[in-house]
Regions:
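N-terminal, active-site-proximal structural segment of metallo-dependent hydrolase catalytic domains
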Residues: 2-6, 20-75, 89, 93-94, ...
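Sec-dependent N-terminal signal peptides
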Residues: 6-16
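Structural recognition of the beta-strand scaffold that forms the well-ordered cores
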Residues: 28-31, 59-63, 98-99, 130-133, ...
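Active-site environment of divalent metal-dependent phosphoester hydrolases
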Residues: 37-39, 66-71, 92, 139-142, ...
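Structured beta-strand-rich core segments of catalytic domains in phosphoester-bond hydrolases
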Residues: 59-145
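Metal-dependent phosphoester-hydrolase catalytic domains
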Residues: 110-111, 177-187, 195-306
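A solvent-exposed, charged loop/short amphipathic helix patch at secondary-structure junctions
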Residues: 142-162
C-alpha cells in the first residue's frame, strides 16, 4: 500500500514538474489597436481591460493608448511601459504606443520615432526578449486595391507614395540592427501596420484579387530581414484563415493589417489566432459578451522558448 502511494506521489510530482516547465517555456503575446484609448464608447477602457482579461496574454503590444494605459494596467495587474521619453507622465493622452507585461521589464529601447516604433526588453524565465510596439500610417489606402486598374508594378509604386512608406524607411535601421542581433536576443514586433501582406496576395489567392499577385513592400521588407509573420506561419492558408483585423460594416473592406512578427533561434510560435468584431457591437470570448471598443481586430500568438 505504501509502495503504491509512493509511486502515485512520484507520478504526481512528475506531472506537476511537467506543468510548471510548460508554464516556464510558453508565453502568449497580443497586439491590439484599441482606438483612441478605448474612449469612443461608454466604459471603453474598462471593456478593453475585460477583453484582455479573457484572452489572458502575457505581453500586450498596444496601439492608440492615449492615456488609458495606467487604468488598464492597474485593472489587470500588469507592468506598464509607455513608449515615450522617460519623463513623460504615464497617462499622457498624446502617446500612441505602449507595452504591458506579466514579466519584469529590462532595458528600454527608445527610437527617434516613438509615435510609430519603440520597445523594451522583457525577461521571460531567464531569456531576454526584445518587444516592439508599432504603428504605421494608413495612407495610401484603398478598400479594394485589386479594383484600382493598376498592374502589380503600379500598385507597388502607389504603395510608396505617402506616409506609411516614409515611416518604414525611417525605422528600418532600427529593425535591421535588432534583427541582426536575434541569435543572442530574439525580437517580437507587433501592432498596426495599416498594410496588406504579401503572404495574403499569392498565387493561391489571386482569384479573389483580380488575378493579382502582389509582394506588398511593407511586409516584404520584414520578411527580407528574416522576421516571421506568426499568424500566417501558424495559419498558412489565407483563404480558410484570412485573419481579418480590419472590417467596415456596409462595404467591402476586410483586410489583415495587424501583425505579430518574430525572429530568433530561442523562440518559436506555436499557435496564432485573430479576434474581430464591429465597433460598438458585442464580441463573445469565453462565453462572455463585451461591447467592442475598437475598429481593429486583435492578433494573439503563443510562443515557446526553445
Amino acid at each position: 500500500m505504501f509502495h503504491a502511494r509512493l509511486i502515485f506521489c512520484s507520478f504526481a510530482l512528475i506531472l506537476l514538474s511537467t506543468s510548471v516547465n510548460a508554464q516556464k517555456t510558453s508565453f502568449k503575446v497580443m497586439a491590439w489597436n484599441i482606438l483612441h484609448g478605448g474612449n469612443d464608447i461608454e466604459n471603453g477602457p474598462e471593456n478593453v481591460a475585460k477583453i484582455i482579461k479573457e484572452i489572458n496574454p502575457d505581453v500586450i503590444l498596444m496601439v492608440e493608448t492615449y492615456g488609458s494605459g495606467p487604468f488598464i494596467a492597474d485593472y489587470l495587474g500588469y507592468n506598464f511601459h509607455l513608449i515615450a521619453s522617460e519623463e513623460t507622465p504615464l497617462n499622457d493622452t498624446s502617446v500612441n504606443l505602449s507595452i504591458y507585461s506579466k514579466y519584469p521589464f529590462g532595458k528600454r529601447i527608445d527610437t527617434k520615432f516613438p509615435f510609430y516604433l519603440g520597445g523594451i526588453e522583457i525577461s521571460i524565465n531567464g531569456q531576454t526578449i526584445r518587444f516592439f510596439s508599432n504603428w504605421f500610417h494608413y495612407l495610401p489606402w484603398d478598400n479594394e486595391p485589386e479594383k484600382m486598374r493598376k498592374s502589380v508594378e503600379e500598385l507597388l509604386e502607389w504603395e510608396k507614395t505617402e506616409s506609411r512608406h516614409k515611416m518604414i524607411q525611417k525605422v528600418l535601421p532600427y529593425l535591421k540592427k535588432f534583427a541582426n542581433e536575434t541569435d543572442s536576443i530574439p525580437m517580437i514586433f507587433g501592432g498596426d501596420m495599416n498594410s496588406l501582406s504579401h503572404l495574403d496576395w499569392t498565387k493561391k489567392t489571386k482569384k479573389i484579387h483580380n488575378n493579382l499577385v502582389v509582394p506588398w513592400n511593407a511586409t516584404e521588407i520584414l520578411d527580407d530581414l528574416g522576421l516571421i509573420d506568426s499568424y500566417r506561419k501558424e495559419n498558412p492558408n489565407p483563404i480558410t484563415h484570412p485573419g481579418v483585423t480590419w472590417d467596415k460594416k456596409g462595404r467591402k473592406d476586410s483586410h489583415r493589417i495587424d501583425y505579430i512578427f518574430y525572429k530568433g533561434k530561442s523562440i518559436k510560435s506555436t499557435k496564432s489566432n485573430s479576434y474581430n468584431a464591429f465597433f460598438n457591437e458585442p464580441i463573445i470570448i469565453n462565453g462572455k459578451e463585451i461591447i467592442y471598443p475598437s475598429d481593429h481586430g486583435i492578433v494573439v500568438t503563443s510562443f515557446k522558448l526553445r
